[in-house]
């Protein structure tokens, strides 16, 4: 096995900074009542803010400082989101809380062209989620974790290289991991002069066991591959839900779209792992607390893609159309993205001589964009309806490909031409000259089953008007035998 450890030492900070596009200073406070700084971004640290500093001191150094209390629940959710995204690289993933992800990457090396290209790809695309991490590769998960924390970028792909890579690591790594060494054990080792792992390995194992440091030897055995280190596998969710708290409430669409892009990067990984696409997803705006007099007000936007798609640029475009269509009623405090029912994507069919000149637009994207911009009900299309009366021979239907409103069987269409532009109400005209009548008459007598008011009895003609247009006119067969124009052919 070959393990890639992805360590996020600044996860407590990045769960808040990943949703912002500007570099306002930000610091994270520890638990109450002390409320001391546990992490700060580079802008805050440039002002003198450091971990361990009190809240008042931090604000005095950086008056524009944004302070957020540490959110362990957000950190756990972020680790799960990253694990879900990492499914695009390997299906063998293990969570190693509080800030580490373990990927078993041996089967993925050929697909990504080797170990170095794979690690580069992981690090680069992690940035699209808004996170920055440290990577290392080793034959055991614990060794990979320690190397990622203390020697990021290390790539140890054989057991023979483990000892030389791990021996120089400081003693403090023993406090890192799922089963860390106790402070008493570390004090014991420091007291007898141990400074690095090589010093501990030279000590008698029996002596360590008598001094209650058995956990230390077990850690080293797992790291150096002397005993197995089984890990539970992460099972990705069947339904994708990701939430992004914003650093500060905002009603700026561009700021929201920056956060949407972060969420879509995670969705892309979830879909990649399934080789699937979506037809729709939901973007939920969580408004600022106490908006409209109560907490928890949120507004869902169902974004229809117009076709089965995995294209995040398409998703971003349609999200923009939804967010810019109407003003936001209040500042948004957080974004949430929800998606389910992914369907397998089929490879695109290409012509042997396919080229740029033969490419066509995407009608599904056009339809989805128009609906996002104008509203769902503002976009409709015409369909034939089985009725001989021209004004009732059509109807509005949903233009979606999945709509059940479109006719499915063969249609009994008239043999004579019909104009595309039909007037809502026929307009009276003078009796036309005989030479202007090009075809006809076509007699239409129908509607008696709907009552006298709906019955028509007409003779239709195709004629040329005085302004050289082709028009569709008729004469009533009932007195007073008036003439009317009903539509235009051009």
Residue ranges of each PLM-predicted region?
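Residues that scaffold, gate, or flank divalent-cation-dependent active/transport sites
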Residues: 1-102, 107-109, 116-117, 121-124, ...
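DNA-contacting surface of Y-family translesion DNA polymerases
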Residues: 3, 64, 186, 190-334, ...
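Amphipathic, charged-and-aliphatic alpha-helical interface segments
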Residues: 42-43, 47-49, 161-202
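A residue-level signal for conserved active-site and pocket-lining positions in enzyme catalytic cores
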Residues: 58, 99, 135, 200, ...
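Structured, non-catalytic alpha/beta "coupling" segments that mediate domain-domain communication
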Residues: 84, 117-156, 215-223
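Extended compositionally biased segments used for macromolecular assembly or nucleic-acid engagement
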Residues: 107-110, 134-145, 151, 157-164, ...
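A glycine-rich phosphate-binding loop feature that marks nucleotide/adenosyl-phosphate handling sites
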Residues: 139-146, 277-289, 332-343, 381-396
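Mature hydrolase/peptidase catalytic cores and their serpin-fold inhibitory cores, especially
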Residues: 351-490
């Amino acid at each position: 096995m070959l393990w890639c450890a992805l360590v996020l030492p600044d996860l407590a900070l990045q769960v808040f900074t990943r949703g912002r596009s500007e570099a306002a200073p930000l610091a994270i406070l520890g638990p109450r009542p002390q409320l001391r700084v546990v992490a700060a971004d580079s802008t805050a640290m440039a002002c003198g803010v450091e971990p361990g500093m009190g809240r008042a001191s931090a604000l005095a150094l950086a008056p524009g400082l944004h302070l957020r209390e540490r959110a362990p629940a957000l950190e756990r959710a972020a680790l799960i989101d990253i694990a879900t995204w990492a499914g695009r690289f390997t299906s063998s993933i293990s969570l190693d809380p509080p800030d580490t992800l373990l990927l078993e990457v041996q089967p993925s090396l050929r697909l990504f062209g080797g170990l170095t290209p794979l690690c580069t790809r992981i690090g680069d695309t992690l940035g699209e989620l808004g996170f920055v991490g440290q990577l290392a590769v080793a034959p055991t998960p614990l060794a990979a974790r320690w190397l990622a924390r203390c020697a990021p970028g290390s790539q140890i792909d054989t057991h023979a290289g483990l000892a030389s890579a791990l021996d120089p690591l400081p003693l403090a790594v023993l406090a890192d991991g799922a089963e860390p060494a106790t402070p008493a054990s570390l004090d014991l080792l420091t007291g007898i002069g141990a400074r690095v792992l090589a010093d501990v390995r030279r000590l008698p194992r029996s002596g360590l066991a008598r001094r209650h440091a058995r956990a230390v030897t077990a850690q080293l055995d797992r790291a150096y591959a002397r005993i197995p280190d089984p890990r539970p596998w992460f099972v990705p969710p069947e339904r994708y839900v990701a939430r992004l708290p914003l650093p500060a409430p905002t009603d700026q669409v561009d700021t929201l779209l920056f956060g949407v892009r972060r969420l879509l990067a995670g969705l892309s990984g979830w879909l990649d792992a399934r080789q699937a696409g979506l037809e729709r997803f939901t973007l939920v705006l969580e408004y600022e607390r106490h908006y409209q007099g109560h907490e928890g007000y949120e507004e869902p936007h169902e974004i229809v893609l117009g076709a089965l798609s995995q294209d995040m640029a398409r998703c971003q475009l349609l999200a923009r159309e939804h967010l810019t269509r109407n003003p936001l009623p209040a500042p948004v405090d957080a974004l949430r993205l929800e998606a389910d029912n992914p369907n397998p994507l089929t490879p695109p069919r290409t012509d042997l001589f396919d080229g740029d000149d033969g490419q066509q637009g995407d009608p599904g994207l056009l339809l989805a964009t128009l609906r996002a911009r104008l509203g769902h009900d503002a976009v409709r299309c015409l369909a034939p309806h089985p009725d001989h009366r021209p004004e009732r021979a059509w109807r509005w239907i949903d233009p979606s490909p999945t709509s059940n409103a479109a006719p499915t069987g063969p249609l009994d269409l008239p043999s004579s031409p019909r104009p595309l532009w039909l007037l809502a109400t026929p307009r009276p005209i003078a009796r036309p000259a005989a030479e202007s009548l090009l075809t006809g008459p076509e007699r239409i007598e129908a509607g008696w089953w709907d009552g006298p008011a709906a019955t028509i009895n007409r003779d239709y003609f195709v004629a040329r008007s005085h302004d050289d247009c082709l028009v569709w006119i008729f004469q009533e067969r009932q007195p007073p035998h008036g003439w009317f124009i009903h539509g235009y052919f051009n």
